[in-house]
Amino acid sequence: MMKQYIYLTLTLVLGLTLASCSKDQLCERSVLPPVSEQQSELDRWCQEHITRPYQAEVIYRWDRNHAERSTHTYPPRLEQVRPVLEALEATVLNLYRDKQFFISSDFIPAHPLLRIYLYGGANRDGQGVDLLFNRKAPSIELYIYNVDTFSPTNPVEVYRLVRSAQHQIGRHLMTIHPYDHDRFLSLGPDRYSSTTEPFADAYRSYEKSGRLREGLGLNRYAYSRGFYSILGMLGAREDLAEMYSVTLTETPAAITRAEQDAAIPDDADGDEEAKRRYAEEAKIAHETFVQKRAFLSKYIEEAWRIPLQRLQLQSLQLMNQYLDKHHATQP
């Protein structure tokens, strides 16, 4: 008798639940956001142009589980997703499908990126520093920020996109083909910081003064300390990936100028003690820069079996072709 009573009760509850659901307009009131026709078309484009050829899932819808808690990221505007991915393919992804460089099965797409995440805004940490990459993410994931401000006619935005992507792909390939971490770390271990706090003011000063491109790449603050970029100061892993990324977005002449300028001491304004200290710091910075440059070149050629300068020139050519196509004034 008790079993019959429980059965009847469950049947009644289920019937009421179904009746209630039948009255709801699920297509309009679902807790999940509806997929619009625009999104569906965009999904098809992403599948055809990115996922199939590169085996990487494109994720542009908001997922709070993949946003760093200390940042202020948000989802991109839909109309910006395709232009950014088109630029990414033209300036970065195509490089890794070029058979004259990557004929080995060890490279992309044999070891593809798993996912590409897109965010509308910057990836600012607690110090207000706009990071080009997600430090906590696995190397098989690519994070693209500042999607909403991207414009194919803005060379600085194109540069930032390429710098970010090349850093992350470089780190991915360095995971596949390990380098001598201890040897690289020995070239300048006392210069690294686990947070952006020591250099946050310097980094933001470039952005605030309208010199974003300089702040992201080669600048005196960085190379006078033996680095290719300010963000390279975050650690050896970030440093080598930054060196790779900067190399692929700067000319050989620009890197040589930075190397030479690193040897020039800061002005001591007549202070003899400061003059001696600055001279010693410049000597160390120059030596460190030279040693790091040689390390990266040797590692790429031996582990990847590709001359770094050939990759550099091809990367610059792809960037210039994209900028020329969109009639942008090249930086």
What does each model-found stretch correspond to?
Residues S193-P265, D269-W304, L308, Q317-P331:
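Metalloprotease/metallohydrolase-associated module, dominated by Zn2+-dependent proteases
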Residues P155-F184, D190, A241:
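Active-site recognition of the HExxH zinc-binding catalytic motif
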Residues L95-Y119, I176-L185, A254-I264, P307-S315:
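Surface-exposed patches in mature extracellular/periplasmic domains of secreted proteins
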Residues M1-T9:
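Bacterial N-terminal signal peptides that target proteins for export
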Residues S22-D106, Q291-P331:
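Acidic/polar, low-complexity intrinsically disordered N-terminal segments immediately downstream
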